[in-house]
A protein has these predicted regions:
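Class I SAM-dependent methyltransferase SAM-binding "motif I" and its flanking Rossmann-like core
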Residues: 128-165, 169
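Short, basic, glycine/proline-bearing loop/turn elements
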Residues: 23, 89-100, 151-159
Length: 267
């Protein structure tokens, strides 16, 4: 691959070319998605994103795209592994696995997956900084290079109707998300989506950290306005750090680290 047809993040590298993996068989793709899903939960657990039984990440099944895999209800993120993942349909019926499902998971995620055929995975947890920032009822400001990953690619769901247990609430969240990669759920937290578990998980981690950075910056500013990134620079930064490839690549660093340190999630 030449630098002329490389993505911006690929063009940053010299030497060996950075490429997405090639096409897999259905069985291999299913295993790959489940491995990445289990890894995402472990990494979320390491980042302190588990809050009791709240939170879920889902990924479509490659053979039956009207069903998705997710974490078993009542199992801590740090204990999730490939073998205890469950598969449910959009009505919340467990079609594979021996654990219960969080009703809120399919109420939100089923509607997102139905509304967005391009979405392979979706993530929502109750992270500390995402929850705190969501109470402000506004989108992230473009105050850093990392925040620019969400430039014109975030939404705000500016209401809270209690714990999401009904499909109509999930449908409103999906409508607010639109065609973007992330939505801030007021008084609730964050939700991100992507064309892979890898990118989806990375967008969540990055947005959670960007919420933290903005609140720290606003606290240090003592009421003074923050210096935001100019529009042209936002667009350039987004082309590097906001693409699906960038999300996939960034998560893979964490995945490789997890495989080296705690490979039992693959069981």
């Amino acid at each position: 691959m030449t630098t002329e047809n490389a993505t911006p993040i690929q063009a940053l590298a010299t030497g060996a070319t950075l490429n997405l993996p090639g096409k897999r068989s259905v069985a291999d793709e299913r295993l790959h998605r489940k491995q990445r899903l289990a890894a995402a939960f472990r990494i979320f657990g390491q980042w302190g994103l588990g809050e009791g039984a709240a939170g879920h990440i889902t990924v479509r099944d490659p053979e039956h795209p009207d069903t998705f895999w997710l974490n078993p209800f009542g199992v801590h993120f740090s204990r999730v592994k490939v073998s205890n993942l469950i598969r449910v349909d959009h009505d919340g019926k467990v079609v594979e696995g021996n654990h219960p499902v969080n009703r809120a998971a399919f109420a939100i995620h089923s509607q997102v997956h139905q509304a967005r055929p391009d979405v392979v995975a979706a993530a929502h947890t109750h992270g500390i900084y995402g929850r705190a920032f969501s109470s402000l009822g506004r989108p992230l400001a473009m105050i850093s290079q990392d925040a620019c990953a969400f430039y014109q690619d975030q939404a705000l769901y500016d209401e809270y109707g209690g714990v999401v247990l009904e499909l109509h609430e999930g449908a409103r969240i999906a409508e607010a998300l639109g065609g973007r990669k992330a939505v801030i759920l007021r008084n609730h937290g964050l939700l991100t989506v992507g064309d892979s578990v890898d990118a989806t998980a990375w967008w969540y981690l990055s947005m959670e950290r960007s919420c933290q950075v903005q609140m720290l910056a606003e606290g240090a500013a003592h009421g003074q306005p923050l210096r935001t990134v100019p529009e042209e620079s936002c667009r350039q930064a987004y082309s590097v750090v906001g693409t699906p490839f960038a999300g996939w690549f960034s998560f893979n660093l964490l995945y490789d680290k997890l495989v080296g340190e705690s490979p039992d999630f693959l069981n």
